[in-house]
């Protein structure tokens, strides 16, 4: 059975989730503080391995990397859900991965408890068995996601925020992404929707925003608007 996370590990992870990336020196000071406050004499690599063992079923990992500019080492919290084409991970896939840990196996019940804790703390959002990054997570981790995943991250063509759950233009030479709420607003008055970038026909389901949600979203910061839930009730048609 894998070693349980203590309060010191949780404090370290909380700081990593807040900052996204820290230098090796900062990580060393944080590790020392966590050990002093909550006890423990582990070396930092062993300490982080305990955290990673519990993060792996959640498609997250603290990884060490070196700066190409000055050669200094940094610790980065990698969120592997970003690598998913759908921007989500199913509960089945997450819990099944608990049996495939590289180091020690994690019981599915333990993985489920950790997963529920992430949802409770509003780092992840669950709906119908699918887990996605919450608004809090996206907003707080956006700077490092743009830096670390710069070749992978795409932004919404309409609002220019990170686009994980979205519709994609099917033109291979275009492939822009648009959030579902942005799709609803952009195509609201268009009976024959076309891609705002390449002008190809937009074949996807066009969501319709609920009136109250659409009105309230006008008062939200741009980074929060993407959480407004659309309802898909109208399909775009060719004329």
From Swiss-Prot:
Where does the record place Low complexity bias? 212-224
Catalysed reaction, written as an equation = S-ubiquitinyl-[E2 ubiquitin-conjugating enzyme]-L-cysteine + [acceptor protein]-L-lysine = [E2 ubiquitin-conjugating enzyme]-L-cysteine + N(6)-ubiquitinyl-[acceptor protein]-L-lysine
Report the principal subcellular site. Answer: nucleus
Which biological process terms from the Gene Ontology are attached to this UniProt entry?
A: DNA damage response; double-strand break repair via homologous recombination
Q: Which GO terms describe its molecular function?
A: protein dimerization activity; ubiquitin protein ligase activity; ubiquitin-protein transferase activity; zinc ion binding
Give the EC number(s) listed in the UniProt record. 2.3.2.27
Question: Which GO terms of the cellular component aspect does the record hold?
Answer: chromosome, telomeric region; nucleus; Smc5-Smc6 complex
Q: Which InterPro entries match?
A: Nse1, Nse1_RING_C4HC3-type, WH-like_DNA-bd_sf, Znf_RING/FYVE/PHD
Cellular localisation:
Nucleus; Chromosome, Telomere
Q: Where is this region: Disordered?
A: 212-239
Zinc finger map (RING-type): 156-199
| PANTHER family membership | NON-SMC ELEMENT 1-RELATED, NON-STRUCTURAL MAINTENANCE OF CHROMOSOMES ELEMENT 1 HOMOLOG
So what family is this one in? Belongs to the NSE1 family.
Name the job this protein performs. Answer: RING-type zinc finger-containing E3 ubiquitin ligase that assembles with melanoma antigen protein (MAGE) to catalyze the direct transfer of ubiquitin from E2 ubiquitin-conjugating enzyme to a specific substrate. Within MAGE-RING ubiquitin ligase complex, MAGE stimulates and specifies ubiquitin ligase activity likely through recruitment and/or stabilization of the E2 ubiquitin-conjugating enzyme at the E3:substrate complex. Involved in maintenance of genome integrity, DNA damage response and DNA repair.
Q: How does it assemble?
A: Component of the SMC5-SMC6 complex.
- This chain's protein is named Non-structural maintenance of chromosomes element 1 homolog
């Amino acid at each position: 059975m894998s070693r349980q996370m203590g309060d010191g590990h949780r404090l370290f992870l909380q700081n990593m989730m807040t900052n996204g990336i820290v230098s090796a020196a900062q990580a060393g000071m944080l590790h020392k503080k966590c050990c002093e406050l909550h006890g423990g004499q582990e070396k930092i690599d062993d300490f982080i391995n305990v955290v990673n063992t519990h993060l792996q079923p959640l498609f997250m990992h603290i990884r060490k990397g070196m700066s190409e500019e000055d050669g200094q080492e940094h610790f980065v919290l990698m969120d592997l859900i970003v690598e998913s084409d759908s921007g989500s991970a199913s509960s089945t896939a997450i819990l099944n991965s608990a049996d495939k840990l590289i180091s020690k196996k994690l019981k599915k019940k333990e993985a489920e408890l950790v997963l529920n804790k992430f949802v409770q703390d509003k780092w992840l959002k669950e709906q119908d068995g699918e887990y996605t990054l919450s608004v809090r997570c996206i907003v707080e981790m956006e700077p490092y996601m743009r830096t670390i995943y710069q070749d992978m991250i795409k932004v919404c063509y309409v609002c220019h925020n990170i686009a994980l759950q979205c519709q994609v233009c099917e033109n291979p030479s275009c492939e822009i992404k648009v959030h579902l709420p942005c799709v609803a607003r952009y195509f609201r008055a268009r009976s024959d929707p076309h891609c705002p970038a390449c002008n190809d026909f937009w074949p996807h389901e066009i969501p319709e925003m609920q009136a109250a949600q659409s009105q309230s979203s006008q008062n939200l910061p741009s980074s929060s608007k993407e959480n407004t839930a659309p309802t898909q009730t109208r399909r775009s048609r060719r004329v």
